[in-house]
């Protein structure tokens, strides 16, 4: 049976190269790097992606990506994962819409915790 194309993938791909300010003071921003790549064991979804939230000094506060191995992994091969401050955890990629929803939920939570947004 042929694999069904993710109908939300174009939305994610359209964000490639975008940087958006996400707080009223203009001090926090998000960046999207999303490209199609051949399907490989390292990139089983055919995507190379990095969705990141940055603070006033440019430091990464949160991110979702699949560009490098997760430190605690047994064999160290790359996999989907998320960063939140200094914590890195595996991320179970489902589809583009879920990735975007999870990313924006993390952004909102961090900005609320820091008192940036109500």
Model regions: which residues?
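Well-ordered alpha/beta subsegment
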Residues: 85-116
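Acidic side chains
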Residues: 65-68, 80, 102, 108
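Short, surface-exposed secondary-structure junctions/capping segments
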Residues: 47-49, 75-94
